[in-house]
Amino acid sequence: LAGIFLGDTVMFASMNRLGPRRTGLLFATHSVFSVLLGVLFLSERLSAYAMLGSLLVFGGVLLAVAFGRREVDAHVWERNDKLAAGVALGLAAALCQALGTFFAKPAMAAGLEPVTASALRMGVSCGAHYLLWCSGWRLAKSRGRYTPRMLGQTALNGLVALGLGMTLIMLALQHANVATVGILSALSPVLILPMLWVVLKRPPPPLAWIGAVVSCAGTALVVLR
């Protein structure tokens, strides 16, 4: 409920107001929330190297996302004035993602199989979304017509992000603490830089690549601590 039903729904609401780039910037803060939850409630401890790596990962992600797109490539969704609501929704999505990881950790540590855990999470989320849709709430209804392209893109997103991505996160929680998993999973905005190069037919700005290098250095410190 926290990670997928609330987290993803609120993230898409933020994306409608801020666009994908700025939403990615806010969503990356879930690594900070994950570290705080792990340290405060699960008695997790990070070494000095891991803490330094965490700061490098977070700073590198912010740098990569903030400068990951040139002004001429600004998404049409970013040209609106709903910043306050979008920022609040983006931070709420990040917190929900961290809470989802936090709640899953005890079950994974107890030996729950990752595919089963992922299926349970998606099943509960699907049921909750169905009930919300059946409620007739205006915001739960589509405002436009569905197209085959739209449905295909959504299905691909669900397969890659939820089917594969969330299962791998559950697997990671079996072998690492919440703080480490949260930090490493925040790298997704950096990993998308080569994809932007392919799609936009132009390389991201140099500062974005510097952010990517900083994040990779931080990842090495976290993993090899």
Predicted regions and their residues:
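Hydrophobic/aromatic residues within transmembrane alpha-helices
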Residues: 14, 40-46, 107, 117, ...
